[in-house]
A protein has these predicted regions:
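Bacterial Sec-dependent N-terminal signal peptides
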Residues: 1-29
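Surface-exposed, glycine-biased beta-strand/turn segments
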Residues: 21-95, 125, 154, 169-183
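Residue-level recognition of beta-strand microenvironments
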Residues: 54, 87-88, 115, 132-135
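Short acidic/polar mixed-charge low-complexity motifs
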Residues: 74, 103-105, 152
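Peptidoglycan cell-wall recognition and remodeling modules
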Residues: 61, 107-113, 134-141
Length: 183
């Protein structure tokens, strides 16, 4: 195993551990909001990854997600609790998983080498749902990560800081049943 692969594996392991002890960008827990109330309800979908293409215009057309590069076959994690509403092949997405979350939020995970979940399955933040690949319209192994609100693609950077792999808590609001995305 090359030094680069070992380093990426170590980073992924450390980040995966951080999933269970997630830190949050832009807001720290306070006495009235204990640390446990902001942990374990979200996870960065591909620990150790780097952004290789952002949301927005690309090559004269729209790009509806954020492309995250890592080593082939890496574990893709569910970003939030939810229900799998699609797991199969879909056009340029290749192998795609769509997960429906609370308050109109859906996350898409595509170009997967292998999908590991089935339609109707409930998943929790941090569950392994797929392996990174190069299916569909993809020029390299990566994860195309997409967030949608009520069916409309929105920049996932609204919810995640892709450099630090942290959550932007300001994009969510707390309810009796947990956190939901602000519309």
């Amino acid at each position: 195993m090359s030094i680069r692969r070992k380093l990426l594996a170590a980073i992924a392991l450390l980040t995966l551990t951080a999933c269970a002890q997630s830190t949050i960008a832009e807001q720290k827990p306070t006495v009235s909001q204990p640390a446990d109330s902001v942990r374990q309800w979200w996870c960065y979908p591909l620990p150790g990854a780097k952004v290789i293409s952002s949301f927005g215009k690309r090559d004269g057309r729209g790009h509806s997600g954020t492309d995250l590069k890592t080593v082939p076959g890496d574990k893709i994690l569910a970003a939030f609790d939810g229900e799998v509403v699609f797991a199969g092949t879909f056009s340029g997405y290749g192998n795609l998983i769509r997960i429906k979350h609370a308050n109109g939020l859906e996350t898409y995970y595509s170009h997967n080498k292998k999908n590991l979940v089935k339609v109707g399955q409930r998943v929790h933040a941090g569950d392994v749902i797929a392996l990174t690949g190069r299916t569909g319209r993809a020029s390299t192994e990566h994860l195309h990560f997409e967030t949608r609100i009520d069916g409309r693609a929105v920049d996932s950077a609204r919810y995640f800081d892709h450099n630090s792999h942290t959550l932007r808590l300001s994009a969510f609001r707390k309810t009796k049943s947990g956190y939901v995305v602000r519309k």
